[in-house]
Amino acid sequence: MAVPHPSSSSSRSHPFLSHVYHTSFHHHHHHNHPSLVLFWCLVFSLLSPLALSSSSSSSSSSSDSSSSSSSHISLGIGETEGTKHDLHQAILRDEAVARLHELGQVSDAATHLERTFMSPASIRAIPLIRGWMEDAGLSTWVDYMGNVHGRVEPKNGSSQALLIGSHMDTVIDAGKYDGSLGIISAISALKVLKIDGRLGELKRPVEVIAFSDEEGVRFQSTFLGSAALAGIMPVSRLEVTDKSGISVQDALKENSIDITDENLMQLKYDPASVWGYVEVHIEQGPVLEWVGYPLGVVKGIAGQTRLKVTVKGSQGHAGTVPMSMRQDPMTGAAELIVLLESVCKNPKDYLSCNVQCNEDTVESLANSLVCTVGEISTWPSASNVIPGQVTFTVDLRTIDDVGRKAILHDLSTRMYQICDKRSLLCSIERKHDADAVMSDPQLSLQLKSAAQSALKKMTGEVQDEVPVLMSGAGHDAMAMAHLTKVGMLFVRCRGGISHSPAEHVLDDDVGAAGLAILEFLESQM
């Protein structure tokens, strides 16, 4: 188990009266005055049957306005479930949305959202998240990597814990849902169980984790938080430095977290103590919006390869070298990039597989392969000079590792052939390789059932099958898969936009995510 860090205790909002009536969330943060409507709900819930009868009699002679107000607060026979539904919705949707907005204001920049590993904003976010965890009845601590934990132990049951998490760091000029939604929806679901007096009914410990670093912006090293808990972070990673020459270890020590080689190793969770890991995350793509569904289950996270391609030719004067005599690396690079696009759009037309590459691999590539050239540079980069060298990057992702390796082999062969034909020198350097991570089938089925049940409760109708899709983006689940089985739930985002201030999730979809996690937790009782 991770060693708690002795940080100062955070202030707690009231566990029940913290913004549970939806109209209050449009104008206030979570720490403002509680709804008077809920106050009267509590008063009436404690009244005797005689008082309830008197209230009912009084309401019959009240004005239309009073009658409308009374319909929100009455807890008479037959109305308890409706009131509970409103309360749950207020926590899972309205309060969660308010908290997303509040956390989205915790930034290192005045003009945009920026919260990187161990920055001042990330330190300010820690007590805020801890306070929300404590509000949900969780015991909290901060570990030696700056991860924030909130845990509840069952009265009886298994010692193997269910971990639910996502990251609290952001990219530069970020949206407020990436990472934060997964943390807040889990906290909200557990708060509902606390309000209902059911936390103790869980059959295993549940631990919510807000990982300190997933994006890797500051140190160009992703998954610092989750990799430490999964036991896959090398000690040497502590010495990696940012642009200012500050190391990971220094950044932690500057914030009174005394990380050492020894206690980094102590952060690793014992696999026998963990039942599984679940992560809620915005899709960061357009599929759910396109199919018109708020939630989807992730079947796996794509494997990824990053290449650096360098093409060298003959540098010369733009006006004096005839076209037929040029060895132009720019036009050569352009042909390579067009080849990449063709291969990734129609992999079966280019793939020359060995016996390992079967029909399933070809189909998987056709459905999941994506390729991107994200950077390109020339030397000497002058308008009147034929370049001497062009360098570009390739990001290639697919759910099928066998297919990814086969495509890379065939792509490289064809690239070298094009360079030879053009009398150019070509080098292909592999900069990063990560295998795909598959979600646990049984855990995915449970999440799918929970999502289906949540959406049925929200709409009152039986919904179509919950979509199952691949994640092209990396997530903390990739690191946690080295520790335990993993499952992920995607939430629809507008236009598929992420890593942008235009990133947006509908309030009802925020509520759907929280309700799905609540349904999943109830299946763990």
From Swiss-Prot:
**Regulation of this protein's activity per its record:** Inhibited by borate, fluoride, L-Asn and L-Asp, but not by phenylphosphorodiamidate.
PROSITE patterns, per database record: ARGE_DAPE_CPG2_1 (PS00758)
Q: Which residues bind Mn(2+) 2?
A: 178, 215, 499
Q: What does it catalyze?
A: allantoate + H2O + 2 H(+) = (S)-2-ureidoglycine + NH4(+) + CO2
- Enzyme Commission identifier(s): 3.5.3.9
Supply the alphabetized keyword list: Endoplasmic reticulum, Glycoprotein, Hydrolase, Manganese, Metal-binding, Purine metabolism, Signal
**Entry GO terms, CC:** endoplasmic reticulum
- Tell me which CDD domains the record gives: M20_bAS (cd03884)
How does a null allele present?
No visible phenotype under normal growth conditions, but mutant plants are unable to grow on a medium containing allantoin as the sole nitrogen source and accumulate allantoate. Partial defect in seed maturation and increased seed dormancy.
User: Which parts of the sequence are annotated with region: Disordered?
Assistant: 56-78
Write out the residues that bind Mn(2+) 1: 167, 178, 281
Tell me the compartments it is located in.
Endoplasmic reticulum
Query: How many cofactors are bound and how?
Result: Binds 2 manganese ions per subunit.
First-level EC class: hydrolase
Show the Pfam families listed in the entry. Answer: M20_dimer, Peptidase_M20
> Which GO molecular function terms does the record list?
allantoate deiminase activity; metal ion binding
Glycosylated positions are 156
On assembly, the entry states:
Homodimer.
Q: What does this protein do?
A: Involved in the catabolism of purine nucleotides. Can use allantoate as substrate, but not Nalpha-carbamoyl-L-Asp, Nalpha-carbamoyl-L-Ala or Nalpha-carbamoyl-Gly. The sequential activity of AAH, UGLYAH and UAH allows a complete purine breakdown without the intermediate generation of urea. Involved in the regulation of seed maturation and seed dormancy.
UniProt name for this protein: Allantoate deiminase
